[in-house]
Swiss-Prot record:
The lineage of its organism: Bacteria, Bacillati, Cyanobacteriota, Cyanophyceae, Acaryochloridales. It comes from Thermosynechococcus vestitus (strain NIES-2133 / IAM M-273 / BP-1). It is found in: Cytoplasm. Pfam families: tRNA-synt_His. Required for the first step of histidine biosynthesis. May allow the feedback regulation of ATP phosphoribosyltransferase activity by histidine. One of its GO terms (cellular component) is cytoplasm. Its main location: cytoplasm. This is ATP phosphoribosyltransferase regulatory subunit. The gene is hisZ. One of its GO terms (molecular function) is histidine-tRNA ligase activity. Keywords: Amino-acid biosynthesis, Cytoplasm, Histidine biosynthesis. One of its GO terms (biological process) is histidyl-tRNA aminoacylation. PANTHER family: HISTIDINE--TRNA LIGASE, MITOCHONDRIAL-RELATED, HISTIDYL-TRNA SYNTHETASE.
Length: 408
């Protein structure tokens, strides 16, 4: 029997680990420079926590068997877990709270997706306890700075407003609202064309409600009689005016996120490839989510975003030097079995400065084979150890510098 990773899981080998760590470290530095602190939440949560009062669909959760009666699952995203932690563990702390994370999430695949990847890596932030223009602008500026630090080239920012889009959906008959919303989420124009008149034309107009703020404002005129639409759109324009011009911005009022807890701005970052636009980040405002976890229904406003690490890695050029494995400086070789204790002590002494990398020779090889191993690994010094004599030091620096660099 050949053992493989479970369906939807994969191994990440050293070179890919190095690439991922390079990216995560740069994102982490940006997060920290804006005052964000790292939070780690459980991989396993109760199903009630993960589904966030019904705003996260249970079918996306990979459920696991626990020791108790309460259903458990692997987190499909982090926002719900952080909201739960903020209510249960961080109550009374000074607001706003700026939190960031870098971790894995799990999403169940079904039907045609069965067998696809089910574990994903994310890095993101949550800003809790702040609402209004300044908080929304901070998040969008933070997204842009991250992309700039990673030297991402061309990128597109799609900005919508979940509340405003819900107001527009509210103009449809109740029996059609779910259908129209699903079509928007799935970019399904064909199904909208099958709706009865006059709702078909109105749904298609909503589907196409994207472009520059000026273009969207003109198309939004047919909904000007809907209460609050004009004022809400004016606030959205004010926010976009604050966002730096390093990203091409498209206002998209047809934008619908898969999680239903968003109450304000929502956004996506797309990067073009040769064949498609790749989604590398998404986020938005969720001012009612924390009330789900509070015993009295009290809430704290929140906004955040997440980078999809795997997708972002495909769009970032990582310098080859960043992926080089740090080489060991010493190879410590016990000449006999009796010299092993002395070799272990000598290797530990060499490591005392905290920065020297030392390997212990483990295989029974000839001296020439030992030297060949050291040259292949670019180890410049060999310490030959006897049980009753001082170490003999052999320098191989000339041979090492002529070898190809070993990568992990």
């Amino acid at each position: 029997m050949v053992y493989q990773p479970a369906c939807g899981a994969r191994d990440i080998l050293p070179l890919d680990v190095a690439r991922q760590r390079w990216l995560e470290q740069r994102l982490e530095r940006v997060f920290q420079s804006w005052g964000y602190q790292e939070i780690i939440t459980p991989t396993i949560e109760t199903l009630a926590t993960l589904t966030a009062g019904g705003t996260v669909h249970p079918e996306t959760v990979i459920q696991v068997q626990g020791s108790g009666d309460e259903p458990l699952g692997l987190r499909p995203e982090l926002t719900a877990s952080i909201a739960r932690a903020a209510v249960t563990r961080m109550a009374g702390m000074q607001l706003p709270q700026r939190l960031y994370y870098k971790t894995n999430v799990f999403r169940r695949t079904t039907g045609a997706e069965l067998g696809n990847q089910q574990e994903f890596f994310q890095a993101g932030v949550e800003l809790l306890g702040a609402t209004g223009l300044a908080a929304d602008a901070e998040i969008l500026w933070l997204v842009q700075e991250c992309l700039g630090v990673l030297a991402v080239g061309e990128a597109y920012l799609l900005v919508g407003d979940a509340h405003l889009t819900q107001q527009l959906l509210g103009t449809f008959p109740a029996e059609l609202q779910k259908t129209v919303r699903q079509c928007l989420a799935n970019l399904d124009r064909v199904s909208l064309q099958a709706l009865p008149a006059p709702w078909r034309d109105r749904a298609l107009a909503l589907f196409d409600l994207r472009g520059t703020p000026e273009e969207v404002g003109e198309r939004l005129a047919q909904w000007s009689d809907v209460a609050g639409v004009v004022d809400r759109f004016a606030q959205l324009q004010q926010l976009l005016a604050l966002v730096a011009e390093s990203l091409a911005i498209t206002l998209d009022l047809s934008l619908v996120q898969s999680f239903d807890y968003y109450t304000g701005i929502i956004f996506e970052v797309l990067i073009p490839t040769e064949t498609e636009l790749r989604l590398v980040a998404q986020g938005g405002r969720y001012d009612q989510l924390l009330s789900i976890y509070h015993p009295d229904g009290a809430t704290v406003p929140g906004i955040g975003f997440v980078f999809n690490v795997e997708a972002l890695l495909q769009a970032v050029a990582i310098p080859p030097a960043a992926l080089l494995a740090p080489r060991s400086q010493w190879l410590v070789v016990p000449r006999t079995a009796n010299a092993l204790a002395a070799a272990l002590h000598h290797a530990q002494t060499l490591r005392l400065d905290g920065s020297t990398r030392v390997e212990l020779a483990l295989l029974e090889l000839t001296p020439e084979q030992i030297r060949a191993y050291a040259r292949d690994r670019q180890i410049p010094y060999i310490a030959w150890i006897e049980s009753d004599a001082p170490p003999q030091i052999e320098a191989l620096s000339d041979g090492a510098t002529s070898l190809q660099i070993q990568r992990v």
